[in-house]
Amino acid sequence: MSSVYSDKSSSTPAVTGGGFGGEIMLFGVRVKVDPMRKSVSLNDLSQYEHPNANNNNNGGDNNESSKVAQDEGYASADDAVQHQSNSGRERKRGVPWTEEEHKLFLLGLQKVGKGDWRGISRNFVKTRTPTQVASHAQKYFLRRSNLNRRRRRSSLFDITTDSVSVMPIEEVENKQEIPVVAPATLPTTKTNAFPVAPTVGPIIFPVQIDKSREYPTLLRHDHGNSSMLVGPVPMFSMPNPSTAIDLNANHNSTIEPSSLSLRLSLSLDQGQASSTRHSAYNVMSSFSNGESIIRVA
């Protein structure tokens, strides 16, 4: 046994120093390097099996190496992520909110309150989803809280509930009311109100005179008709209508009451005969032909 170990110990520097490749002496045991390298790492066996091919493809196309790795089942996860990022490089941008939608959002915020984004989206901002309404509300409140800290350029969020009046959901229901057509009225002419003096015109009516009572002396000589119809004629002249109405700038006119009155004193009673002496009618009798004549002065 001692001779065996001595032989091995004596041969060890020869092996290592002689540069015999592929073997090493580990604790007196001769170990081959190539089988051991194959079992060192199982992560990249394809690189060990094709060392020359990988060295030649270092300056080549990376797509070919990735395809080979994918075919052998050892593709990297980073390559797959990079491939997906290349396909979705252009990010889909959302449609910005319009001023009308923001005003409807503020109106819904007044009516419904914070938190009910589904109700605001359903009843007010119908063009946006509840998630979009919630995101817009978050940006709005952040803008309002940071408003006093620093000045920012004007944006849509500067329109607040204070500046937006409560729209009669004329803009929501909206803003379109049919005007009621007023009925056409006839044109009226304005006349200056001024007092008009009452005019007294001649009143003509038949008067039947009974000669037998008022004038009993006529009965002796009158053998014909006992009564006759007389149309009285007024004793006064009618005034000019232009002088009866005084139109001045102040529309003040003083009209004296007419002192003329038509008195028809034709009474049938004997007791009133003396009071009718000054009547407008003068009765004269003529006995020449036996007839009574009535003359009007």
Curated annotation (Swiss-Prot):
Region (Disordered): 44-96
Keywords from the UniProt entry: Cytoplasm, DNA-binding, Nucleus, Stress response, Transcription, Transcription regulation
Pfam families registered for this protein in UniProt: Myb_DNA-binding
Molecular function terms, GO-annotated: transcription cis-regulatory region binding
Gene Ontology CC annotations of this record: cytosol; nucleus
Domain HTH myb-type span(s) in chain numbering: 89-145
Record's protein name: Transcription factor MYB1R1
